[in-house]
Amino acid sequence: QMCIRDRGWGRFRNEQICRLKIRRIKEEWAQNLVARPWCISEVVRAHEDCPELQAILDEYHKPVVIQDEVLGELTLDKDYDAFEGEIQWCGKGVRLSLEVNAESKPSWTRARNAAKRLVTDQETWDKAMRDFAAKNLTGLANNWLSQDEESARDPETAPITEEEFAQRILLTEVSVSPGGRFTAYYNDDDMFWGHAVEVSGSLKKGITYANLAG
């Protein structure tokens, strides 16, 4: 069994430029691994001046912003490989996240095109997502209601209906991938005690999944 030592963890901060000596890990610690990884054998300098690496880091920190005629301003979050922005969805502001490969601009274009198809036909998609979520989760909402000791509403005599469920959930975020898959996140209006309602599908196959998240 591999022995994991705590010594050294937390020694390096994020984006620290340093000079290290590295070597292949000993075979005895890599018996169950496909390939022998590398490990640090010595910290030569904990803080190193390196113009080449500093230039790369400076370039990394430059904001990447796209102006789209439909989606508005989108800013790349390089830590999460996603463009973030806000769109108008059925008259309300909704957060938009485009999942991309930060190093592949074609993926940016595909994700934008997929999102624009979704946004352009938003009324149809909005109804489809709400109806699907209501069909699949209204029963669960009534189950939660029956366990809510603070609610005066009795799910036996005054249950939450699918129509009510569809109207109560509030869209807060839409995430879209280059392949046309998307996930919508809804505020649950406290039907699930603060959990988000997650609805996902694709432009090709339609809505395929609804559940709770968070």
Each predicted region: which residue ranges?
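A structural detector for beta-sheet-dominated domains
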Residues: 21-23, 77, 88-90, 97-101, ...
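Flexible glycine-rich surface loops and low-complexity tracts that mediate binding to linear polymers
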Residues: 10-34
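Long, charge-rich alpha-helical interaction segments
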Residues: 98-101, 105-161, 165
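Short, small-residue-biased leader/transition segments that mark boundaries at the very start
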Residues: 2-4
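Short peripheral tails and domain-boundary helices/loops at the edges of structured domains
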Residues: 36-67
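Contiguous hydrophobic, core-forming segments of folded domains
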Residues: 59-128
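C-terminal structured interaction module
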Residues: 161-214
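Broad gene-expression machinery/nucleic-acid interaction feature
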Residues: 17, 35, 82-84, 93-95, ...
